[in-house]
Regions:
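Peripheral, non-catalytic segments flanking oxidoreductase cores
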Residues: 1-302
Length: 302
C-alpha cells in the first residue's frame, strides 16, 4: 500500500480515505452548511470577510485574477481563544457553531493521521528516517471552508458593479497552499485534477470517502518528489454543488523548506509560512495585479 500511495503522491497528489468513522458527523455538517447558504442575505453579509480578516462569509473570491462562481464561509481553530476571536459566527448560531467545532476537531485528528501516512510512504520509498511531525509543531493554522457553488453568479445583480468578470470555471485551477487538504464533496461532481500530461481528470464523488490532496508545503518539504495537486471546479449547469475542505496548515511561524533527510540538493529556499499564506489570502480578496504567490517564487534555480 505504501508504494501505491507514494506513486499517487508523485503522479497527481490525490488519494481517497475511507473507513474514517465520521459519517454521522459529516451528515450533520452537510445539513448546517446547506442551511447557512440558504439563509437570508443580510445574515450572511453580517459576517462578511474584509481585507484585514479573511474569516467569515465571502462571495466574490478571486483565483488567478478571475472571480469564482461560489460563496464560502471560513473559520479557523474555534477551541483556541487566540484564533477564535477572529472567527465570525452568525448570530444565534449555537447549533451551527457547535457542529463545526466538533467537525474541526475530528478533521484535525484525521489530518494528522493522513500526514503521518504520507510521510510513512515517503520514508518507505526513499529509505529515509523522516519525522512526520518535525515540520508542524503543536499549533497549526488549519482552517475549514464551507463552499456553495450555485448555478449562475453567486453575487446578486445589483451588487456586481465594479467586480471582476466570472472565470470560465467555477473555481480556477490552483494548488492549495498548506500541507494537505481533506475534502468532502457532495454527489454533484465537478471537481477535476490535472494529470502529469496536463489533461484534466474528473474526481468522481465516492460515497463514504474523503478526498485528500497534497498542497504546496508538502511539495516543498519533499523537494518536488510529491506534487501539490492542481485542481479546479467546472461550472454548475443544472444543480448546485457543496463541498467542505479542511486545510491542514503549518504553524504560523514555521519555516517551510525541504526535509534535510532526503537525498539531493534542496530545490527551494526556505520561507515563512505566515508570509506565504498572507500573500495567498490577500490575492484572493483583491486583485494584486499579478499572478498570485506560488512556491515557484522560492525555487533556487528557476
Amino acid at each position: 500500500m505504501l508504494s501505491e500511495l507514494d506513486q499517487a503522491c508523485i503522479d497527481h497528489g490525490f488519494f481517497l480515505l475511507s473507513g474514517h468513522g465520521l459519517d454521522d458527523l459529516i451528515e450533520q455538517t452537510w445539513a448546517i452548511t446547506e442551511q447557512f447558504f440558504a439563509g437570508d442575505r443580510a445574515s450572511k453579509l453580517a459576517v462578511m470577510r474584509d481585507a484585514d480578516n479573511p474569516l467569515g462569509y465571502f462571495d466574490r473570491e478571486l483565483t488567478k485574477r478571475k472571480r469564482d462562481s461560489k460563496e464560502v464561509f471560513d473559520f479557523t481553530d474555534p477551541a483556541d481563544p487566540r484564533t477564535d476571536q477572529h472567527n465570525r459566527w452568525p448570530a444565534d448560531s449555537d447549533t451551527f457553531r457547535g457542529t463545526l467545532v466538533e467537525f474541526y476537531d475530528a478533521c484535525s485528528d484525521l489530518a494528522v493521521r493522513a500526514n503521518e501516512l504520507v510521510h510513512h510512504a515517503l520514508a518507505f520509498a526513499t529509505a529515509s528516517d523522516i519525522d512526520a511531525t518535525a515540520s508542524l509543531g503543536s499549533r497549526t493554522t488549519s482552517s475549514v471552508r464551507l463552499n456553495h457553488y450555485p448555478v449562475g453568479d453567486p453575487v446578486p445583480e445589483g451588487e456586481r458593479v465594479g467586480l471582476h468578470d466570472l472565470g470560465e470555471t467555477a473555481l480556477g485551477h490552483h494548488t492549495d497552499p498548506g500541507v494537505l487538504t481533506l475534502l468532502l464533496q457532495d454527489m454533484t461532481g465537478g471537481l477535476q485534477a490535472q494529470a502529469v500530461d496536463g489533461s484534466w481528470v474528473d474526481i468522481e464523488p465516492t460515497p463514504g470517502t474523503i478526498v485528500v490532496n497534497l498542497a504546496d508545503a508538502m511539495q516543498v518539504w519533499t523537494n518536488d518528489r510529491y506534487r501539490a495537486a492542481v485542481h479546479r471546479v467546472v461550472p454548475m449547469t443544472s444543480s448546485d454543488r457543496y463541498s467542505i475542505p479542511y486545510f491542514f496548515n503549518p504553524p504560523r511561524d514555521a519555516v517551510v523548506e525541504p526535509i534535510s533527510g532526503l537525498a539531493g540538493d534542496a530545490k527551494y529556499a526556505g520561507f515563512r509560512w505566515r508570509d506565504y499564506m498572507r500573500a495567498r489570502t490577500d490575492d484572493n480578496f483583491a486583485d494584486a495585479g499579478a499572478e498570485d504567490a506560488q512556491i515557484t517564487d522560492y525555487l533556487l534555480t528557476p
